Amino acid sequence: RLLMVRQYRNALERYTLELPAGKLDDPKEEGIVCAARELEEETGYRSDKLEWLITLRTTVAFCDERIEIFAAHDLIPTRQNLDEDEYIDVKAYTLDELKKKIFSGEIEDSKTIAAIMAYAVKYNR
């Protein structure tokens, strides 16, 4: 099962279903450190077993943004630590449920789609 977050996105003026994500606190911060922090802050779970999955370049014609995707295994419950303006619901889904949500259009976030599909390929699911 994969943990997903449902949160309101102002740019779309609606809620979206995404994988937990965030940005580096400092340009020198390692992606895996950021991933661990954001996982715990947004979901209330931590993992001592984060594994690099893929690196994405979002729009190579326009910017140099890079997104690193990690898979978190053996989750340990802690507690959410949300920003004042964050309201996030957390729910676990099977990979098959998430694939259906992608192809029905319920999941539109590109990093989430890429991560789910990469996970499915890597783990032959």
What are these model-derived regions, one by one?
Residues R1, Y8, A72-P77, L95-D96, ...:
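Short loop segments at secondary-structure junctions
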Residues R1-R37, L75:
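Conserved Nudix-box catalytic region and its N-terminal flanking loop in Nudix hydrolases
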Residues Y15, W52, V60, D85-R125:
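Nudix hydrolase/Nudix homology domain
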Residues E18, I69, A92:
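Short aromatic/basic micro-patch
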Residues R46-L53:
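A short coil-to-beta-strand element that immediately follows conserved catalytic motifs
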Residues T59-R79:
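Active-site-adjacent beta-strand/loop module that shapes the phosphate/pyrophosphate-binding cleft
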